[in-house]
Swiss-Prot record:
Active site: D39 (nucleophile)
Known function: Responsible for synthesis of pseudouridine from uracil-55 in the psi GC loop of transfer RNAs.
Recorded superkingdom: Bacteria
Catalyzed reactions per annotation: uridine(55) in tRNA = pseudouridine(55) in tRNA
Keywords attached to this entry: Isomerase, tRNA processing
Keyword Ion transport: no
Full protein name: tRNA pseudouridine synthase B
Length: 306
């Protein structure tokens, strides 16, 4: 049975669910999931799990993400991106690059962000975007996010300077809305702003260099096998033959070297445990003087792409 991660370069106009559907056909299995949605207008890294690798997706969802984006200053839209109707315009002609960089700096670090009202967040059991489309004025609560990096690469005047297109790179915590960053940057500068382009270049340890288009994957289904995926994602622990046997039966073993320290493996941040042959045996959490399995992966002879 084929199991592993597929790093897809999602095309513009496709929903994440569309990509999952296509992968189900390519992989010949219904058991395919993704590690965090990407808006239809966005392109770039979408991490999919096939069969047993779907169990790794929980640990990928919460990792940091990196994006390249273009923010247009001078116009606000109902969706905070280029797909929505323009609801206000204010000339950005007087906005300097220095002012932009200062506003960007204020949006870097740990901030409170109000998600875009046109989002998949549920409000009383209904998606926020559905409420907005029905004419409701939706107000979402602010939530803490971390902007690790917010770099300005270029500022390009358009329409005789009435709008400014700002090319940026953003590295951020899971749950950050880049559309909301564009909106908030525009509000801070008094011009309004929205997102016109978005490309995700990294999810956790998985990068655009590893990603393949759907066309490429239709020709050759490149799968990052389980042990490689887990080695890149979390701390590693090498097991002896006896330890691997004990863990494969769900039994506990001696705790890892980091037990009792802030680096100790936990259920939320486990260590990947490998047999002497390099195969992924389990995910482990330290508990006192012992390590216990959080997830156990049955041994298999699967080969990626076979």
């Amino acid at each position: 049975m084929l199991s592993g991660l597929v790093i897809v370069d999602k095309p513009q106009g496709w929903t994440s669910h569309d990509v999952v559907g296509r992968m189900r056909r390519l992989a010949g299995t219904r058991k395919v999931g993704h590690a965090g949605t990407l808006d239809p207008m966005a392109t770039g890294v979408l991490v999919l799990g096939i069969n047993k690798a779907t169990r790794l997706l929980t640990y990928i969802v919460g990792t940091s993400k990196t994006y390249t984006a273009t923010i247009r200053l001078g116009e606000s839209t109902v969706t905070d991106d280029a797909e929505g109707e323009v609801v206000s315009s204010h000339s950005a002609a007087a906005v300097t690059e220095g002012a932009i960089r200062a506003a960007v700096a204020a949006l870097t670090g740990e901030i409170q962000q109000v998600p875009s009202s046109v989002s998949a967040i549920k409000v009383n059991g209904e998606r926020a975007y559905a409420r907005v489309r029905s004419g409701e004025d939706v107000k979402l609560a602010a939530r803490p996010v971390t902007i690790h990096r917010f770099d300005v690469h270029a500022v390009r005047p358009e329409r005789a300077g009435a709008v400014l297109d700002v090319d940026v790179t953003v590295e951020c915590s899971s749950g950050t809305y880049i559309r909301a960053l564009a909106r908030d940057l525009g509000e801070a500068l008094g011009t309004g702003g929205h997102l016109t382009a978005l490309r995700r270049t990294q999810v956790g340890p998985y990068t655009l260099d590893q990603a393949r288009t759907l066309e490429q994957l239709a020709e050759e289904l490149e799968v990052l096998e389980m042990s490689q995926a887990a080695r890149a994602l979390m701390p590693n622990r090498e097991l002896s033959e006896d330890e691997a046997t004990e863990i494969s039966f769900g039994r506990r073993i001696a705790a890892g070297a980091g037990a009792g320290t802030p680096e100790a493996a936990t259920a939320d941040n486990p260590a990947a445990a490998f047999a002497p042959d390099g195969s992924l045996v389990a995910l482990l959490a330290d508990a006192g003087g012992y390590a216990k399995p959080v997830l156990v992966f049955a041994p298999s002879n699967e080969q990626p792409g076979k």
